[in-house]
């Protein structure tokens, strides 16, 4: 099935999520590292997820979302989304594709899409203070710390307080 491609480079593209992606996306949301990184566990069965929790613009949770596709083989290697409300860009790279710079490439594509196509003035991104890899990726993509946006959450597994760091990037093409 052909899918809409939102934006890409020589290695990856961000493309629309299709029904065939539901299984791998659902599995990703149930992966321990993803739950730990988002501090959230999906409360839906697979059927409920397939019916209502799609990472696309038809969702009340996401204002935009896409799968991350590797162009050499069209493999879906992750997901990226912009949350509804506060424009917060989120990403998950599936476990077998981590530590290969795909996250940075895809996040940069997501930032470009948000600024060039969605025409946003600024975007937020966040990670927990113990997530060094995500923090480095966010900073490599040009985001700056925004301590006013930091939030403390109870850890999903331990119940302890956990600080989520906020970062922001402004559209360089928008008037200040």
Language model features with spans:
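Acidic, low-complexity intrinsically disordered regions
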Residues: 25, 32, 36, 58-60
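Conserved GNAT-fold acetyl-CoA-binding loop/helix
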Residues: 33-54
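A short helix-loop-beta-strand connector motif used in the catalytic cores of GNAT acetyltransferases and
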Residues: 54-67
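Acyl-donor (CoA/ACP) binding surface of acyl/acetyltransferases
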Residues: 1-32, 65-176
